[in-house]
Amino acid sequence: IKNKCHKCGGSGVVKGDEVVEVKIPAGVDNMSKIRVSREGDAGTNGGPAGDLYVVLHVKASDYFKREGNDVYSRLDITPAQAALGDEIVVRTLDGEQKITVQAGVQSGNSIKIKGAGVPYIQRPSQRGDHIVVVAVKTPTKLTEEERNLYKKLYEIQNNKKATQQSSIMDKVKGVFQ
């Protein structure tokens, strides 16, 4: 080539930056790769451009934990809510949703919200589940009224235990008489 282009030096390729819009589907996970056809480097000798591969880095949430297509969150409740049950509004991927906490729930029990997890990439109409893990939080600072109520509850529960234990002992004594 006698008269080489001063921009490309006769190669037909000029280095530069280009903004490419990439559609990211719901449900992608960290380190997922998306291929964008013919948006990569220019081909050699006038050939077609290569493909652009975008590697996704998904930021972790402070509230949700993801395992596959299921998401987990924690729900702190009071001992009274655990004993009596309650209706509580929780945060989900789609906004707020009311769930029912059954009476007698224990720390570590979970409540499943079916279909409220992350969409499956191959089947976007289907989703994983949202699992709400219950944590019963014992109060550390009590008002005088709360302290008195807890004392009364303590006495009631201890009397019930003492009654149960004495009835068991009476049965054992009856066997030996």
Task: Kindly give the residue locations of the regions a language model identified.
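Non-catalytic interaction modules of co-chaperones and other macromolecular assembly/maintenance factors
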Residues: 1-177
